[in-house]
Amino acid sequence: MGERLLESKKDHQHGEILTQVPDDMLKKKTPRVKSCGEVSVGHASLNRHHRADTGHKPYEYQEYGQKPYKCTYCKKAFSDLPYFRTHEWAHTGGKPYDCEECGKSFISRSSIRRHRIMHSGDGPYKCNFCGKALMCLSLYLIHKRTHTGEKPYECKQCGKAFSHSGSLRIHERTHTGEKPYECSECGKAFHSSTCLHAHKITHTGEKPYECKQCGKAFVSFNSVRYHERTHTGEKPYECKQCGKAFRSASHLRTHGRTHTGEKPYECKQCGKAFGCASSVKIHERTHTGEKPCSSNTSKGQGEKIA
């Protein structure tokens, strides 16, 4: 009762009210910027972060209670752009943030951040193959499929199968041509948020993921995780047919084709088919006359592709 909830300053010349959250209100508890999920300790960092997140300027002229962002579906109005976007996605079913681990999609950055904790490797469900621990049973079952090769989700268009529904959903966009993730720098569009994120780094040159062993930096979490296995010698993906082990699920899949005879990569020039993408690229040079850079092909380097 009688508590000062909002500090307001009247601009008599323009007849508008300038608002700012008061210091004593922010000190009551650890503040949270809900538009992006980032937590800030202290009112100063919260104010700075909120302005960076929303684009608002300190003491910006704005009519008190103004809500310029109106939902086209239910006409609900919002004063904050991130809240407005998240609300509209609730109507459209849009979930623009994809988890790289399991393919599950989320409506906001804060939601996917919370979800990623589930993949942290600290949980009660331990994988018998590689020892990784998962937070919940559903994630454990999805993870286990990377070892067993089980792919229960099949594309109705081409019959290609996937280990989880999120991957199938992204794959189906290759048939529909849907590319909902657009780069703000160059306008290039992508099938998934993961591809967009990897592309954006080509503009910035940023490599945020660093190897704890040698300090080498990478553009994606999956890349640094694969690289770290070169230090540990870990090869958690084992072929059921011959027992050969690999550092990544993709290498196991490629190897598996030597047993099944599957050759999904076809030369555009002559139609010859291959078991892996690198083999078809090498073959295509016989048509183009292109020669690989000699500096990358010194004696004793490289690996023969079977």
Swiss-Prot record:
Any Gene Ontology biological process: regulation of transcription by RNA polymerase II
An annotated GO cellular component: nucleus
Pfam families noted in UniProt: zf-C2H2, zf-C2H2_6
Keywords from the UniProt entry: DNA-binding, Metal-binding, Nucleus, Phosphoprotein, Repeat, Transcription, Transcription regulation, Zinc, Zinc-finger
Zinc finger (C2H2-type): 31-53, 69-91, 97-119, 125-147, 153-175, 181-203, 209-231, 237-259, 265-287
Similarity-based family: Belongs to the krueppel C2H2-type zinc-finger protein family.
Protein name as catalogued: Zinc finger protein 625
Biological source species: Homo sapiens
Upper taxonomic lineage: Eukaryota, Metazoa, Chordata, Craniata, Vertebrata
Gene it is expressed from: ZNF625
